[in-house]
Regions:
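C-terminal non-catalytic accessory extensions
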Residues: 449-499, 503-514
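Short, contiguous, pocket-lining structural segments
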Residues: 249, 314-318
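Generic N-terminal simple sequence motifs
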Residues: 447, 458-461, 487, 501, ...
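The feature marks the mature, well-folded catalytic cores of soluble enzymes
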Residues: 1-309, 505-508, 512-760
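Ferredoxin-type iron-sulfur electron-transfer modules in oxidoreductases and energy-metabolism complexes
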Residues: 287-313, 324, 328-457, 493, ...
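Generic, well-ordered alpha-helical scaffold segments in large soluble proteins
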Residues: 72, 76, 80, 96-100, ...
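C-terminal alpha-helix/helix-terminus motif
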Residues: 439, 473-480, 548, 552, ...
Length: 760
């Protein structure tokens, strides 16, 4: 199993990957596509900058009282029937997860895409324990089958094109799926093969492992945003669910999601919403796993929290927007960074999370940037990545000096000796000119020699001239010619020039001394500012919460109000008080038409009905899709059931486990509400909605939406929903863009999605 531990430092790795022209072409095409989609959507959202400001403030506020929020989160998860484990590092987290899986005698786990589990190398720990790991995200499956490494935070196989993926599937998937090979490398055909390959594994899985995009302290809820439906499969079907979540993912309140959900999909893939957003807390009777474990991971986060500058990186929501605009990433790819976190955010996260001052790979990352600032311009939580890069570069130099930099001190001493003596300086000019002219007769050099190697790797360096300027002056004017400083027009100017010439050696000595003094001053940290080392550890024993509390005691964060001037804000009471938004969404009478437009843009279809024609409309939709065997919640209103047509309709309370649901053609359910701005329907387990698996396993889903349930935007939706409810947000059929950024509908969730909209 490959991992990043054998990676070369960035300067050497980048040379290797720059030579891979196919990878560069794949990246250039993919990142350009995402940039264009994001740019178009940001132009549409007039309050995007206000959302970014609010998101940064919410994350900073959460970090500033993270110890209290962790305790609140733990209490609420336990109250909902879950179990909470705190892990100080990767080894502790892996022991917890392996222990749970082993205790349940499971030989296989299914996994949702998770950066946190990749960070701790959980797959490797599970395999060592004799447990098979099945990656269920399409891109992660491509990486796993290809024995490759991920190269992007959101699209891990972005460096692969469709032809390469086809070859991987033909070589590694079972013959009953691939047959004699794929007739084409069409992304839809490849995605369908992945669906077939994974379906039986989902249905038989006893244990699943996930991460989370957010953990809500107020309710104890986990939030997972995904596209393919594999996340819903893992979160809903197995008996046991283990979520490994970094402590930096905690946010205070359910209401805060109204900000992050508007930013995440837009920044990650240029979409208004990802097809699926799942929220759950603890365990629920007959709805999802019967056992839930939350592993809260530190692994360097509390140490990062102690750095007043570096802790900005903990705001990150893993959207990868910075990767998509980075000119360095686009040319060298993600593997060159030697970390599960590539790109600009990886260059500031990895060195801080690893806390290893002597790791050459981590040490090189802050220098893997041009500091152009494009990353800071697109970051949805306003992380000033260029500032962090400079900050970490400074810390890297400090550590190198503390380990002893004899070469640098020797160079400074030699420079002082040469600059303090005109005779030595002139001798050096003559020698360097003679050597340079002999070795490089063309007068230019690209030779990668000594300290010039990084400069000359990309530039021609001028060779010292054979005849220095002073020698040329003497030959042109003779030994008796006027000295350079005596070309002044007046006697006073000439006297001043002679004094300057006599003072030159002393000035050179002072310059050399100043250079040595500055080197010592930096090494000793004489500026007086406290700069936490990567190796800083809490000075007292204790768990994760204790480490966080100590970090905040040593480096407190001042509380600040969260500005909320985005569209629809201001309805959450005094705690969220704000001035009225100037970016108001269209009033409610326009919301229905906007919902229809946005929902259909994802590939869903909308049929209109009146209260008296719902059954006929539902029947027509089922007939159109050739769905015959229908399952509905036990409390779905009777007048909504089709009375005409050759349909077999049964209530869900008479259906057995998930395997039985998978055999049904379609499900018909009600909803909690619909969101016009994003074209989303929301299910929260209320009347007529049934268990979560009901809207997941049948290949055709019909959702009945009443006109009064349509709200304008996310803030309106959040105020209507119960924070403690298990929720499923659906924005179109399941989909993937993991193959060359081509959108393919219908992966693991329903491939056909209809809304019957009941007008008032």
């Amino acid at each position: 199993m490959r991992d990043f531990r054998d990676s070369l430092p960035f300067p050497r790795a980048s040379e290797q990957f720059l030579a891979d022209t196919q990878m560069r072409a794949n990246l250039r095409k993919a990142t350009a596509t995402i940039r264009e989609k994001r740019s178009n959507l940001v132009a549409e959202k007039k309050d995007f900058e206000e959302l970014r400001t609010s998101a940064a403030a919410i994350k900073d506020g959460a970090l500033g009282r993270l110890d209290a929020l962790l305790e609140e989160l733990e209490a609420n998860v336990v109250a909902a029937g879950g179990q909470v484990h705190f892990a100080r590092d990767a080894d502790e987290a892996n022991r917890v997860v392996v222990g749970i899986v082993t205790r349940h005698r499971a030989s296989e786990v299914v996994k949702v895409k998770s950066m946190t589990t990749a960070e701790i190398r959980l797959n490797e720990a599970l395999v060592r324990a004799g447990i098979d790991v099945v990656e269920t995200d399409l891109a992660e499956l491509i990486v796993q089958l290809g024995e490759d490494l991920p190269s992007h935070i959101v699209v891990p196989a972005i460096h692969r094109n469709r032809a390469e993926i086809r070859r991987i599937f033909e070589e590694k998937m079972p013959r009953e799926i691939t047959g004699d090979g794929f007739p084409s490398d069409d992304p839809a055909a490849l995605a369908a093969a992945a669906r077939t390959h994974l379906r039986s594994r989902f249905l038989r899985a006893r244990v699943a492992v996930s991460g989370a995009n957010f953990a809500i302290a107020e309710s104890g809820s986990m939030v997972v945003v995904e596209s393919e439906g594999n996340g819903r499969m893992c979160l809903t079907l197995p008996e046991v669910l283990i979520s490994v979540v970094g402590i930096d993912k905690v946010i205070p309140r359910f209401a805060d999601l109204e900000v992050f959900l508007q930013l995440l999909a837009c920044s990650a893939t240029g979409e208004r919403m990802s097809p699926y957003t799942s929220m759950w807390r603890g365990v629920s009777s007959r709805d999802g796993p019967s056992e839930f474990h939350l592993v809260l991971l530190d692994n360097g986060r509390s140490a990062t929290l102690r750095d007043p500058v570096g802790r900005q990186a903990l705001r990150c929501i893993r959207c990868a927007a910075c990767l998509n605009v980075c000119p360095v990433y686009e040319r060298v790819g993600g593997h060159a960074y030697g970390s599960v976190y590539p790109g600009p955010i990886g260059a500031v996260l990895t060195p801080q999370l690893q806390q290893v001052s002597t790791d050459p790979v981590a040490e090189a990352l802050p220098f893997a940037s041009t500091l152009c600032g494009a990353c800071a311009e697109v970051c949805p939580v306003r992380i000033d990545i260029p500032r962090l890069l400079v900050h970490l570069r400074f810390k890297t130099i400090e550590r190198r000096e503390s380990r002893g930099l004899g070469a640098e001190r020797a160079a400074m001493t030699a420079a002082a000796a040469v600059l303090s003596s005109p005779r030595r300086f002139e001798a050096l000019e003559r020698v360097s000119g003679w050597v340079g002219g002999f070795v490089f007769p063309s007068g230019r050099t690209r030779a990668r020699l000594g300290p010039l190697r990084r400069w000359t790797a990309a530039r021609d360096a001028p060779v010292p001239p054979r005849q220095p300027f002073r020698a040329w002056w003497r030959s042109a004017h003779g030994n008796g010619g006027a000295a350079l400083g005596e070309l002044a027009r007046s006697p006073a100017d000439a006297r001043s020039a002679r004094r300057s010439r006599r003072a030159a050696p002393r000035a050179a000595q002072l310059l050399g001394s100043a250079m040595l003094w500055w080197s010592d001053r930096r090494r000793q940290g004489a500026s007086g500012e406290h700069r936490a080392s990567y190796d800083d550890e809490p000075s007292e024993e204790g768990g994760v919460v204790s480490a966080v509390r100590l970090a905040l005691r040593d480096s407190p964060m001042a509380p600040a109000a969260v500005p909320r001037s985005y569209a629809g804000a201001g309805g959450w009471g005094s705690e969220h008080a704000t001035e009225p938004s100037e970016h108001a969404i269209e009033p409610s009478e326009h919301a229905i038409e906007l919902f229809v437009e946005r929902f259909c843009s994802y590939g869903g279809e909308v049929s209109r009905a009146t209260p008296g024609t719902v059954a006929a409309a539902v029947g027509a939709v089922l007939e159109k899709r050739s769905s015959r065997w229908i399952v509905v919640p036990e409390d779905l209103p009777e007048p909504w059931l089709p009375t005409k047509g050759d349909f077999r309709v049964e209530r869900d309370d008479r259906v057995g486990p998930a395997l039985d649901l998978d055999a049904r053609d379609a499900a018909v359910v009600a909803c909690a509400l619909a969101i016009a701005e994003t074209g989303t329907v929301v299910l929260d387990g209320g009347v007529g909605q049934g268990r979560r698996a009901l809207s997941l396993l049948p290949d055709h889903l019909v959702v009945v939406v009443e006109a009064h349930q349509v709200v304008a935007g996310l803030p309106d939706a959040m105020r209507r929903l119960r924070p403690e409810s298990n929720q499923t947000w659906i924005s179109g059929p399941s989909a993937t863009v993991d193959i060359e950024l081509v959108r393919v509908q219908g992966v693991h969730g329903p491939r056909k999605l209809d809304v019957v909209l009941v007008d008032a």
